[in-house]
Amino acid sequence: MVRNSHYPTHPYWYQLCDRYGLYMIDEANIESHGMGYGAASLAKDTTWLTAHMDRTHRMYERSKNHPAIVIWSLGNEAGNGINFERTYDWLKSVENTRPVQYERAELNYNTDIYCRMYRSVDDIKAYLVKKDIYRPFIL
């Protein structure tokens, strides 16, 4: 499985993945960690909701007919908040056959997969012994 980086990928890449059976995580063009985390995150500022929604919508419309895509990703390292909750809700309303992941959602509702980056072996072991896990873990 390959994860597209949070920038639009060349259309030929999608064709190659479809043709040769490579599974793909397609990722919305959202990365704003340079603007801050926590309260300063653009994910929590509804002024940026339209931009988040537009980029998620464009990803979906561009890629929805590619069979190689098995997971949608809402973006990369952009904090978590109302903007990602709304984009998750929208994406699940139009597409309910493929899971949606968002790394910064951690264990919040707006991700179907626990997909934390840069985890240690101890972090993985700690997740696996939790009693209430119901999401797959992908690095």
Where are these regions (language model features)?
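Substrate-binding/catalytic cleft of secreted carbohydrate-active enzymes
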Residues: 1-139
